[in-house]
UniProtKB/Swiss-Prot annotation:
This is Malate dehydrogenase. Belongs to the LDH/MDH superfamily. MDH type 2 family. The keyword Oxidoreductase applies. SUPFAM superfamilies: LDH C-terminal domain-like (SSF56327), NAD(P)-binding Rossmann-fold domains (SSF51735). GO terms for biological process: malate metabolic process; tricarboxylic acid cycle. It is an enzyme of class 1 (oxidoreductase). It comes from Acidovorax sp. (strain JS42). It catalyses: (S)-malate + NAD(+) = oxaloacetate + NADH + H(+). GO terms for molecular function: L-malate dehydrogenase (NAD+) activity. Keywords: NAD, Oxidoreductase, Tricarboxylic acid cycle. PANTHER family: MALATE DEHYDROGENASE. The keyword Iron does not apply. Catalyzes the reversible oxidation of malate to oxaloacetate. CDD domains: MDH_chloroplast-like (cd01338).
Length: 328
């Protein structure tokens, strides 16, 4: 028996990440090869953006994806999020030249307050929300706070790109296959302060840390490389990472929806006080996922260096949050 289609809303749908994302969702890569989807695509009510969205929709139609049960174009979140089961909030205000961080936070607070309110009003009560648009953790916090009738746990931020970047760097250094690396995690904010933690990581049951055995490389090369990878891609490509961000969004949602089969993955989720992170802060944690629910991996020992890194990324997140509290 064929499954009933689920509704997937994507904001910023005509942008670079949207373009790298939509075809993969429609082909079944995110929710499974047996799950039909209806795409509810949101773009700003600007003629150029709406025309670009029309072009993307034409291409989606021209792929004749068997799982694509419908496509809708929207300029209002109140219609785009109607009954949606999954919402990928990709569209955000990018930082322009000479723009202060406070201005960026304020501009995004406006967007994510409106989107949170719309989700609260019209989305499915079980909607799974992934915020991709930066600053992702704080934007997820804003949307969550603007949707008091939805469970806070339904709002997540994307740290999977940092996680995947970290796995790739460790694989290259240690000569491992990237898919063999288990129990890697990234703590904190999706920003250069994130802390990619390899202390528990294994390949074939053996410690990655012991196999690499180079603490100076870990601190002086690995952590800055992962933290500044986005900037390095902009410098090289002249554009921000879009395909890798879309890929991470697919990974995050697929594992949340279909389960991580006991493996650790990194998700930015609202804290309940785990590891001393104040409740409500959207923070990168190691999680396992099953039956559409995530669970933070608890009880991991935190050494002095790790605590220092976690405190640093937490302080940055608290600063961002304090910067938007008056707007909520």
């Amino acid at each position: 028996m064929s499954k009933k289609p689920v509704r997937v809303a994507v904001t910023g749908a005509a942008g670079q990440i949207g373009y790298a994302l939509l075809f993969r969702i429609a082909s079944g890569e995110m929710l499974g090869k047996d799950q039909p989807v209806i795409l509810q695509l949101l773009e700003i009510p600007d003629e150029k953006a709406q025309n670009a969205l029309k072009g993307v929709i034409m291409e989606l139609e021209d792929c004749a994806f068997p799982l694509l049960a419908g496509i809708e174009a929207h300029s209002d979140p109140m219609t785009a999020f109607k009954d949606t089961d999954y919402a990928l909030l990709v569209g955000a205000r990018p930082r322009g030249p000479g723009m202060e961080r406070a201005d960026l936070l304020a501009a995004n607070a406006q967007i994510f307050t409106a989107q949170g309110k719309a989700l609260n009003a019209v989305a499915s009560r079980n909607v799974k929300v992934l915020v991709v648009g930066n600053p992702a953790n704080t934007n997820a916090y804003i949307a969550m706070k603007s949707a008091p009738d939805l469970p806070a746990k339904n709002f997540t931020a994307m740290l999977r790109l940092d996680h995947n970047r970290a796995a790739s760097q460790l694989a290259a250094k240690g000569g491992f296959k990237v898919g063999d690396i288990k129990k890697l995690t990234v703590w904190g904010n999706h920003s250069p302060t994130m802390y990619a933690d390899y202390r528990f990581a294994t390949v074939d049951g053996k410690s990655v840390k012991d196999a690499i055995n180079d603490p100076a490389w870990y601190k002086d090369v690995f952590l800055p490389t992962v933290g500044k990878r986005g900037a390095a891609i902009i410098a090289a490509r002249g554009l921000s990472s879009a395909a890798s961000a879309a890929n991470a969004a697919i990974d995050h949602m697929r594992d949340w929806a279909l389960g991580s089969k006991g493996e650790w993955v990194t998700m930015g989720v609202p804290s309940n006080g785990e590891y001393g992170i104040p409740a409500g802060i959207v923070f990168g944690f190691p999680v396992t996922t099953e039956n559409g629910e995530y669970k933070i991996v608890e009880g991991l020992p935190i050494d002095a260096f790790s605590q220092e890194c976690i405190d640093k990324t937490l302080a940055e997140l608290q600063g961002e949050q304090d910067g938007v509290k008056h707007l909520l």
